[in-house]
Amino acid sequence: MTVTAPATNAPRAVPVISPAPLLPPADFGPVDRLQGWAMTAVIAALAAITRFFNLGSPTDAGTPIFDEKHYAPQAWQMLHNSGVEDNPGYGLVVHPPVGKQLIALGEAIFGYNAVGWRFSGAVCGVITIVLVARITRRLSRSTLVGGIAGLLLIADGVNFVSSRTALLDGFLVTFVVAAFGCLIVDRDQVRARMHLALLDGRIAETPWGPRLGVRWWRFGAGVLLGLACATKWSGLYFVAFFGLMTLAFDIVARHQYRVPRPWLGALRRDLGPSLYALVVVPFGVYLASYAPWFASETAISRYEAGRSIGEDSLLPIPDALRSLWHYTYGVYRFHSGLTNSDGNHHPWESKPWAWPMSLRPVLYAIDTENVSGCGAQSCVKAVMLVGTPAMWFVAVPVLGWALWRSIVRRDWRFAAALVGYSAGFLPWFIDIDRQMYFFYAATMAPFLVMMIALICGDILYKPGVNAERRTLGLIAVSCYVALVITNFAWLYPILTGLPISQSTWNMQIWLPSWR
């Protein structure tokens, strides 16, 4: 005899309706450490090969090319003049010292030659690529997406040329990307501390939420931003943008962890330490970079107090600082005077609206006389700073996707990358009359790459798709990365000064504005 259970009417499942936003998941960074470091090692090796191979070529008959002609000699002067430049005859000592000090390190090792004045820039180029791979891995929580970002930056023409020439922008890129990475780690660390406070029941002890303790990653970001400003003044833009970004991170974290008054909590608990870490610390680092200038008896404008500026001061400011201010103001006047309306023009200048798609690159060097080695009667050797079109030509849809993800989907990863990109782009519209060049966009390249890699991650890891669609996504991303690498390989001769035929040179110049 079979006994059956009495029929029962199972109650319908009641949907859970949360009266408040759900708490964020306990996700504070990638967990696949071994795979992450293996990816990093591969990316670093590829970056080193591309950045250091044939680093000493080309030159202008053994001398620097383009604006290397300013910075390589000034760095050499620093080596032999107690850390300061000794030849201001042309009035072109118009940037802070850190970038030139780094160039001088390479010259101290290898001497006054192309490898010497480019070595430090190549090292920083490799570091930047590794940083972008690691940062994108942390943003996406995917080692694969981080590796894609590293490959894309390796194959970017702007980053490639910036890493292999002794200009200051490559160093600036390294410092701002490193500072950005520190603030991303700081964001994860803040959320880990907020999570511990939640578990301990300390979230609502006060209306403003818990104190978050010493935040060393944010302090490190301040040091790096100070070094950025001590390389080029445009580092100040990143101080402002990154400062607002990290404060926004804090407000959102306090809101998501249900702090009763998150805005006031961020202002009360976080604003003061943020100002210290991202304003006071960078200013201190900037002043410290002038230590050789303060110690010198012959540095430019070192003893202006009592000469071109009076001995008396309304405030008890040391004469050395007053002299530095006088020198700084003179540099500011130099830069502010480089305007088109005053008759300052350059055949390769450009305006910022042309930068996102690399519409007006910069020709660093060209030689068409007595050049051989291309297998044709007429050969060309040229170095052009130009973005790899497979990435830069899609900048507008990439930015559109990033804005949509940031605003509509509230995806903080794209928002953070947009902040970095905007810091390198938007401030240049303030004075559009100023003489500007595409190499100013070098700071935009890493953040463009991050956004492209994050889009690749969206395609690879789109939730709710079947295996067939996932495979198609993998194929699409693989084809795109292969396209970028192929495009870079095609442009390689005009990024490195290899001899090519005149017909090949004409094929390399894709747009009329590239001429």
Walk through the language-model features, giving the residues of each.
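Aromatic-rich transmembrane-lumenal/periplasmic boundary elements in polytopic membrane proteins
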Residues: 52, 57-80, 266-267, 271-274, ...
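Transmembrane-helix motifs of polytopic, lipid-linked glycan transferases
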Residues: 119-140, 178, 397-402
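Start-transfer (signal-anchor) and selected internal transmembrane alpha helices
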Residues: 1-53, 269-282, 470-479
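Short acidic/glycine- and proline-prone juxtamembrane loop motifs at membrane-interface regions
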Residues: 121, 161-171, 231-234
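Extracytosolic helix-loop segments that constitute the early lumenal/periplasmic catalytic or substrate-binding loops
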Residues: 52-58, 63, 67-101, 105, ...
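Membrane-interface transmembrane helices that cradle and orient dolichyl/undecaprenyl
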Residues: 12, 179-217, 247-257
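Transmembrane helical bundles and short interhelical boundary loops of multi-pass, membrane-embedded
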Residues: 2-8, 209-217, 225, 244, ...
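Transmembrane-helix signature of polytopic, membrane-embedded enzymes
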Residues: 39-43, 132-155, 174, 192-200, ...
